[in-house]
Structures are given as structure tokens and as C-alpha cells.
Amino acid sequence: MNFLDNEDINGTAYYFHSTDGDRYYEGVNLAVKFADEIKNYSDIWQWIKARIKAGNFAGIHVNDFIRWQTTDNKWIESRIAGINTYKRYGDREVPNHIDFISKDLWPTLHVMNPVNYNNGVIPMENLSGDGTKTAFVLANEMAAIASVTIGGTATTAYTYDVNTHTITFTNAPAAGTNNIVVTGTGSEYPWLASDLYLYANSLKGHVAGGTSKTSPVKLVDYTKDGIWSKLPEALKAVIVTKRALLPQRYSASGVLSNNNTWGWQDMGKLWIPSEIEVYGHGVWADNAWDKGGFVQYPVFNCNMRRVKGLGDGGGRTTWWLVSAGAGYTSNFCYVGSAGLATNSGASTTWVGLPVCFRIS
């Protein structure tokens, strides 16, 4: 059935195909529709935040959008993916919110990881003391150190230079083979351990440098050229961190090909959706740990809005999902350029990402 609905806003009648009948609704530009209302705020982001905080979603619908420019003049069209989709969810109850996912992708492609690896990453390195040496250069380019033990006893009597990857002890450790254990910071969660997470959120950190548990990590720094660094300050001011029940894939004993548990984690100010959030069910991430913490975003229900271009209005391009592929140690799921569900190695270079954020 195909019928029209209408809505009067400040004397202007807006006509659109019903959002509930045939699910065909192209969305409207909120800056135009609510121009008179927005005039009372410093910017459109303060307006939408006030609306959300008040729980006032009148006249605002899934697939409506706000267009904005990055600090380097790229256009992004942020579409409403869901209104209160996760309200009351979580270990920390989620309040009123809107999750936005860009209609098209960030204009630059980016790998999920520099190597085909989809596990969490917590680097560890063994060193051998000689009783006189105090400074050791690590093979791992650790962004930070979580703990150090000497002969099984924890110590904090050291400094660490992240730029040279050098740990310097106050006193020379006793002689012994592999008697010093240095454990870096990291995450058991594939998304939080990924290069793409750091790139999206303009962070500095270490990522997998190889495909085995013993492969040294490498340091990357996106603080000046990651996506978050390009967002306007007015938008940054209203974005909140998305928290979710993320799948974990990590074991100290070896590389895993499936998720082995889950946990409540902050996904970042900028994130990408899971396979469930796009398709509504598991396909290549068909694992209970991946499926139990998510629901499908309404914007993707019964349509092909998951087909996205590279850059604003660009040609159809594949894009990453947060879900690691089931049965693989190397792959992450992605949305194919034609809209199909598929997966590929984490170092695949022809995959992009949308700009996704939450305002509450």
C-alpha cells in the first residue's frame, strides 16, 4: 500500500510517504524543517540535544538528516538511524538518545588492521636481566605499560619512553633468563584493539603487527589526522560515548577463530555498527556472543539504505562492521558495495566506514 502522510510545521505542510505503511520515507533536512525553532539556539546541534534531552521527538523521524561540514570542508549527511533504539539498555542505563549514521562513507578508505588479525591485543614481552643493565628497548612498540614483574614480583620502579619504546628501571633487575615480564595496555575486544577504532577516534595506540600471539605490536598515531579531529567543535560538544555489550575474542594461550565471551565496553565517540545492527541477524558473525547485545537499527529495516557511497554522493563502496568473522582469525564483516553481507581480511584496503555517533 502506498499513501501519503503530512505534517504542518510553522505553517508549512510537509508531505511524505508513510513511515509505517510501506516504509518508504526519504527523510527531510532538519535544518530546513525546523529553521525557525533552531534560531533560538547557538547551533543545530544544541537544538537537537535539547529536543533529545526533553524527550521531544515530535516531527523528527528515522532517516531525517543533518548536513554538516568537517574542518577540512568535507560534507557529511548524518541520518537518524534510530530514536531511543537502546533506551534503558545496558549496565549503565541509556537515556533518551538519537544514533546517527552517515548516509555515505567517510571519503577515505581505511583498513581494520594493518595485518589480517581479528583478535584482541594485549602485548607482552619477556626481558632478561643481567644485574647491571637498567634500560631495555622493547621489540613491541607499546603505547603504554600496564604492569611489570621481575622474578614474579610486581614493580612500579621504572619509567617508559613511548617514542623510543624504552623501559628504564630505577635499579638494575637481577640476572635471569626472561625474568622480566612487561605487559602493555590493550583490549580483549577486536573493535577496541583495531586500527580503525584508533583512526575513527583520532587516538594514539598500538595495533597488531603480525598474525600470531608473539608478533610485536606497532605504534600508530591518529591524533592529528583521524576522523574525530576533523569534526566541528559544535558537534563534538554534544556527542556521547556509545556503550555496548561487545563480543570478546582473546586468549593468552593462542589466536582464536570465534568469540569466547562478551562484556560491557565503551565503543568510542565514533563507532561503526555490528552485523546485527545492520542486517538484523548474524550472517558471517553467526556467534551468540556477537548477537546478544545488539538490535537492528530502524533505518536499515526492509530496505537497502546500507548501500553507501565513498564520500558525499560518491560511488557505491564496501564498508566495515564491528563484528569479527566467525570461524576466522583474520576476517571482519563488512557490507558489500551492492548491499550484500560478507567478510574479508582485516588488512583489506578497499573498505571504508560511515561516521556514526550518539547524542543524548
Language model features: what each stretch is:
Residues 1-14:
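Short, intrinsically disordered N-terminal pre-domain segments
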Residues 4-6, 41-45, 59-68, 145, ...:
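Glycine-centered loop/turn motifs
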Residues 8-9, 84-94, 128-132, 159-164, ...:
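Short, ordered beta-strand-loop transition motifs
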Residues 9, 26, 141-142:
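Glycine- and acidic residue-enriched flexible segments with recurrent GG/GxG motifs
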Residues 9, 70-72, 150:
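Structural motif
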Residues 14, 99-100, 136-138, 165-171, ...:
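Generic recognition of long tandem-repeat/solenoid scaffolds
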Residues 17-122, 184-360:
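Collagenous Gly-X-Y triple-helix signature in extracellular proteins
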Residues 120-184:
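Extended beta-strand solenoid/passenger and fiber regions
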